[in-house]
Amino acid sequence: FIIFGGVFMQTDPFKEYLKQQEPDKKYKGYAWQTAIGLQAVDGLKPSEYLVDAAIQNIEGKITLDEVKKLLDSYYEEKPQKNHDRTEEADKVSIRIAKILSEHAFSFTPNEYISIHRKLFTGIYDHAGKIRDYNITKKEWVLNGATVIYGSASELRKTLEYDFMKEKHYSYKGLSMD
């Protein structure tokens, strides 16, 4: 029996809401593989220290929070010039693995911006912020071709439009080819 709000109840009204647990070994492997793979797309490579900690997490020896604490301590004790951006790769990898391990998500521009903030806080000053200036960038994945990005003044509206279009698009019947 439970007393809830001054009312005597026979069952727990929150019993069906379970606290999310860490994922199983297979899913942890997927999350880490994805996290490290996404870093490779930007030409970044994580440290062996992170890879070892990720394996310990996959094996169930340590939690994601413990991986983060170990990593934070590692970089506090061993500051680097970081010309190869290994620290960034390590910190963003653990953050990606953590986000992929959460079962909370909403397909909205705010969630998108929140993910950017979670990934890049402490790495970039603009983490979780919509830029207020126009940019271009040469992309190595496009053999150095320059990409012109959307106008800064319209980014919020463009983002909302793109999300709305994507929500209403049907992938039913499309092949993987």
Language-model segment annotations:
Residues 1-177:
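FIC/Doc superfamily catalytic core
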